[in-house]
Each structure stands twice: as structure tokens, then as C-alpha cells.
Amino acid sequence: MRVKNKKLFRVLGVVLTILVVTSLLGVGLQSIEAAEKERPIVVGSKIDTEGALLGNMIVAFLKAKGFKVVDRVQTGTTKVVREALISGEIDIYPEYTGNGYFFFSGKTDASVWKDFEKGWKTIRDLDKEAHGLVWLRPAPANNTWAIAMRRDDAEKANIKTLEDLASYLKSGGYFKIAASEEFVSSEAALPAFESGYGFTLSNDQIVVLSAGNTALTEKAAAIRQDGVNAAMAYGTDGQLAALNLVVLEDTKHIQPVYAPAPVVRQEVLDRYPEIEPLLEDLFATLDLETLQTLNGKIAVDGEDPKKVAQEYLKSKGFLN
């Protein structure tokens, strides 16, 4: 009888141990899951004006929706911020679809990146497979290389597109552009425009500015520095309207489409799937004119990017 009791006690002891261990494991797993849910979302961005604007929008919007957020806005250059996302140092940042051509050099046809929808879907599929990154739907804007002219000169010569510019140049019209060395020499920039539209600028028609940013090239055109009446620009540059410059339409789609989109690590979306519709609704409101205006408040008027972002979110009903 004692032997049977001993066996019974042993069995009960084993069962009790299993129950205790299972219970502890359950509590442990719940704690891990809870901790995962409590992990903050780290938001980064590039260091430029638009990077600061979009990054601050994402930070403010997610905070307003109750997410814990770590602000790493203006993380660094494209290379720095992308590597931070891939390594998991940050969880979200806004990137441009056209950069997919360089991220996956040699793996796609260049023409893909000149189409808004195809470019987005291509980088979405490539980055998800290669790095577990998810490209949400981009904003309906294109921040690509562009040529801008003084509005008065463009209107006087009836120049609205790069095709118009080509005809104007062939007829001997006056034109002088301020640009960076990269814009002048990169096969993807001025040479691509020249080849695509059938014109060639002489050295006398180009002023290369060493600093190489659009803030300086656009200002040079605005004040006619050294006779300049045109400038290297980006499509969403904030000071274009303020400086009375107009972007000439790239009717042949020579340049890739650089549409800004939130890029999120897959594991973060798995934890917080509601982020996707929230950010896509926000970015759907950011068309070209809107981004130019908002960028202008920062670059021209000197307003704080956080303030500009929050005021815009309030105006659209995203913040109370």
C-alpha cells in the first residue's frame, strides 16, 4: 500500500510540476507578448527639409493615435537612414520610390521607375523579399530632378514644358541655368534631359555652384545671379513659389518618379497592423502643391518643422 502511495505521490508531483511550469511559461509568454506590444515605434527620416516635415508628421500622428513613439527624425543621409531601417535601429522612415532603382541596381529595367504605380509595386516587392520592409502607398507627388525657370521669362516665351524649352533653345532663346556638378554630369540628370528632348547646353549656359543644393540654385535664378534665369530643382521644393519660379513639365517622363512613401519594418506592422491605413490616409493628402507649400514654410519662412507638421495635421482633422 505504501508503495502504491509513493507512486501516486510521484505521479501527482510530476503532474503538479508540469502544471506549474506550464503556468509559468504561459505567464512568461504573455509578458513577452505584452512587452512586444509596449515597444515604442522608432521614427527616423532624412536630414533635408522634406525629410524633417514628413518625419515629424509621422511622429505627431502616431502619438495622437496612442502609440509610443521615439523621435529620431533627421537621422542622416539616405544611406545612413536606410541602413538604420534594415538593421532595426529605426522602424519607419519616409523614402522615395525612385531610389529603388539605386537600391536594387541592375535588377530592374530603368523604365519601371518612370511610372508611379509600377515603380511603387516594384520596390514594394523587392524590399519585402530582400529586407522584410514594407512600402506603404506613396503620396501623389513627385520630388524628382527638374528644371525651373523664372516665371516671368517662362510666361513671356510661353514655356510650360521641357519640349517648349527645347523649341525655344533651337530658336536661339536666352537661357542660363544654375546647377550642381552632379546635376550637370550625372547621366540621370541634365544629360538625360538633353538627350530626351534633343537640346544641348553650352558651357556658357551653365553656372555650376559648388555647394550644389537647390536652395542656392533657385535663389540664383530668382535674383538673376550672373544672368541666370533657370535652376536645377526638385519637384516639391518649398521655395519655388515664393521665388516666383515655375517647374517645366517633363512630358516624356525622362526622370524617375520620386514619390514619398512611409517604409515600415514588417515585424512592426505585424505588431501594429493599424499603422498601414492610418499612414496611407495621411500620405494620400500630400500632393505636389501641398508639399511645396509646407516645405516653403520651413525653407523660406523659417518655421519649425514640428510646428508646420502639427498645424497641417490639425487642418486636415488628423489631430484635435
List PLM regions with ranges.
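Short, low-complexity disordered leader/linker segments with a strong preference
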Residues: 1-40, 320
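Short helix-initiation/N-cap motifs at beta->coil->alpha
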Residues: 49, 71-83, 181, 204-219
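Short, polar/charged alpha-helical segment
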Residues: 49-68, 191, 195-197
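Conserved dinucleotide-binding and phosphotransfer motif residues
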Residues: 65, 88, 224
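Acidic helix-start/capping segments at beta-turn-to-alpha-helix junctions
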Residues: 72-90, 97-102
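Short, Asp-centered acidic motifs that coordinate Mg2+ and/or phosphate
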Residues: 91-92, 228-230
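Contiguous mixed-secondary-structure segments that line small-molecule binding/active-site clefts
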Residues: 98-191, 195, 199, 203, ...
